[in-house]
C-alpha cells in the first residue's frame, strides 16, 4: 500500500526521522503496567519500536486510511487497532480497569484535549509520553511565575511529575508543521490523591486562570466566598504566583468556607 496522505483537518504531520521515533518510544520505563496505547499512530513510525518491547501495544486511530495501512503492514497489531476517536472512546472497553501507558505523536489541533481526557483515566495511567507542539509541551511542564504557567500546568502537575525532554525541528515531518515540537514525559506521583475536593480544585484552578491578570480576590468572585475568607493574604496574589500545592491549600480553605 502507498504511503498515507496527511490530512490537514486531522492535524496530521507524519514523523519521518526513525531515530527520534525510537527516542520517544524509549522514554517509557515500562514498569508497573503491561499495556501501551499509542494515540494517532499514522503509518507506524513509532509503533514499530513499541512492538519490539515487552509490552502489549494497542493503537487508536481515527483516520481510516491509516488504519488500513497499519493493518496491512503490522501483523503484530492484529486485533489491537482501534478505529475510533480517542476523545470519545471508552478506553475500558479494552483495558477493563488495567494499568496502561499512553504515548504518541499527538495531533496539534487536539493535543490539549488529549491531555485532559487522559487525566480522567489517571488512576490507570502511570506514565504518559509523547510529542506536542513545543509551546504546549512547555506549558504542561512550566513552573509558577511565568506567562506559560496556567491551567494545563497546574492540573497535570497535581497528579504527575512532568519533564520536558527535547525539542524536535519542523523538518523531520511530512508535511512540516509551522512550529517546533517538544517531547515530554509524565510519571504519576506515588501519592496522587488530592487532599481536597477534586471537582472544586478543578473549578478553582480554571476560574482563577480565566482572568489571570487579576488577583484571586477578583478572579474568584463568582465562587461567592465569604468576606472573611477573601481577606486572606493569598487573595492578594495572581494565579500564576501559586504553585500546585498552594492551589490545593487554597481549595481546602474554600471548602472550609462552606463552598
Swiss-Prot record:
Its EC number is 2.1.1.182. It is found in: Cytoplasm. One of its GO terms (molecular function) is 16S rRNA (adenine(1518)-N(6)/adenine(1519)-N(6))-dimethyltransferase activity. It catalyses: adenosine(1518)/adenosine(1519) in 16S rRNA + 4 S-adenosyl-L-methionine = N(6)-dimethyladenosine(1518)/N(6)-dimethyladenosine(1519) in 16S rRNA + 4 S-adenosyl-L-homocysteine + 4 H(+). The keyword Transmembrane does not apply. PROSITE patterns: SAM_RNA_A_N6_MT. It is an enzyme of class 2 (transferase). Belongs to the class I-like SAM-binding methyltransferase superfamily. rRNA adenine N(6)-methyltransferase family. RsmA subfamily. Specifically dimethylates two adjacent adenosines (A1518 and A1519) in the loop of a conserved hairpin near the 3'-end of 16S rRNA in the 30S particle. May play a critical role in biogenesis of 30S subunits. This is Ribosomal RNA small subunit methyltransferase A. It comes from Flavobacterium psychrophilum (strain ATCC 49511 / DSM 21280 / CIP 103535 / JIP02/86). The gene is rsmA.
